[in-house]
Amino acid sequence: MRFFFIFLFLSSVSTFQSQVLFVSFKDSKTNEPIPNVQCKIGFSSNALGASKDSLSGFSLQNGEIYFALTTAQTGLTTAKGTIEFQLHYSHPIYQSASKFYAFELKEDTTKLNLYLKAERIQEVRDIIIKSNKPDTVYASKTYSVADFELGANGALFLLTYEKNLMKDAQLQCIYKDTTLFLQQIPERAEALRRDFRGNVHVQTETSMYGLQSTDATLQLRSIPKDYFYKYIAPIVDTSLTRQFYSSYIDIYPAFEYGALDQLDSTYKAILHIQDDLMMELYRSEYKWVDIRTKLWAKNLENQTGIDAEIYVGANVFTKSLYYEPVYAPLFLSNDTLYIFDYPKDMLRVYTTDGRLLKSIPIFHHYHAKQSGFQKNLQQDRKTGKIYTIYEQEGHVYVGLLDLKTGLVVQKVKLAFRYVEKVRIYDNQVYFVYRPFESTQKKFLYKQKLPVRDN
């Protein structure tokens, strides 16, 4: 809960007075809003409580909690005409307190800014690996590595270029130091994308190119880009009998995870993800656009039934500096689903049939400006371990997550600064690197991680 509003409507025998109390919680050092603070306001004769995840008789709307009181109970106001109340607030990693406040019913709005001090910050000791340089996986005097992916059988897929990625990109497939495939991409290449089956595709402006095995030879085939993102990309992972879907699109701050049973074709929703603050800003953009844009959005609403605020948010607010796509990745490990619900500060653990096992509070993403936390969780597909990436002053740190506690149990600092395209496979970190101010092509390196049971 970044902000909450308390509307107090007090009535007396002869007059009716209203008062708005605006309370915000911020970090005392960074001045950033603190999400998911649990609050309770108490009067002498009644008490109101609310938290972001558990509400009792109160409405949670767009990241704000509204209390509505209409009461003539005695004890709410003093003889001086002031209202007195006790405010209790708590947070797992910030100081908790219970304070007494009193204010007069003269102004329409009273602002109360509370600055909390972090009391429980997770400290992880960096693990310094041997000073030897990482091993070189791919080096060429002709080609630079723009992107790469690792296949399940150990095959290495490289998107390389000689001078310009947009003009002379090639897809290479290397297995056990042998180049199995090398072919020019006929369109402007953008990046490599892996699908739920582990197949690697080259993303271009209009198509997705992938390798197809025909008569023991590899051939480059293409499918329409819109087909890939409509029917293939939504499948996040699969178990023996289920496919796990995501309705995520980067221009909407909410989506849903669900599972499709391949035996009886039944679909079950697993978890709805939403960034409440971003959703409120997203929808409120409609209030500030010009009349022409509002009419355009209303016409679309009449045609499709989709709210006009969503059309404006998707086409206007997502292009602003304030919009951040919601981040809440799902991973399948040992027949268990792990959903990192960052908007709610929770790690949700599910069975593959969609039954919630537990919710674990997580805070390793807090103070991102100081810690360098990147929205880039990765799973080692060989070991099943999940890692989070941090970046500070050009140095990249790889943090191992404990799936039982949600804590980062170790951090490993990579040997080089300003590395690109970090991937983790078989307990090793792969990355693209070129020395600063060097004429060397971009090479692919790997650095071994310390072995630790998770």
Report residues per predicted region:
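A short, amphipathic beta-strand motif
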Residues: L21-D27, L114, I127-I129
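Short, acidic Ser/Thr/Gly-rich low-complexity loop/linker segments typical of extracellular
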Residues: A47-T71
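A short, solvent-exposed loop/turn motif at the edges and junctions
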Residues: A79-Y101
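Short, acidic, small-residue-rich periplasmic hinge/interaction motif at the N-terminus
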Residues: P92, Y115-V137, Y143
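Beta-strand-rich domains and repeat architectures in extracellular enzymes and scaffolds
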Residues: P134-Q170, Q184-A191, Y322-L337
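Structural motif
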Residues: N164-Q172, S207-S213, D250-D261, D290-K294, ...
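Conserved blade-ending motifs and adjacent loop-strand segments that build the rim/top face
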Residues: Q183-E190, D226-K230, P361-Q374, T405-Y425
